[in-house]
């Protein structure tokens, strides 16, 4: 079982489409019984429900609050088990809630944007489209205080960085992908998206 927050539209307004939201940081807990720290997304998801969408917000593996094994499941492979949980969420929408398999999108920011891009590049055809905000595309260029606890360092473990970085899968892009990134971002560098873009469209 994967903990998640589900937003369901009223039957009379349902359009049969689904959206999966991927929270950021890679370690936050977002499926809980109090006000979401993603309050903007919380309000946006309720708006999407009013427009007929079913929205699923998953505390994928790597998220805190579910024990050591859950938290450390992404060691040496970001975009592995954490992404598999999004794919399981997609199956849940289709098999349990009768969401149209051809009308499912995925989106998120920061780590959520990274997972969005990895989903489209490593599992083409599973999602109709994705929106990736301020996304890491090459973990070797990100803050090593963050990545070294998960992927080690590029010098010591280049394999982990390569299989975890979307830029190495860019040529697989088949689906609709929107990437948005502020040029003044001092956490995830804007250059990450710039480097990925021409590779994706050559």
Q: Where are the regions a protein language model picked out?
A:
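Serine-hydrolase catalytic core recognition
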Residues: 1-201
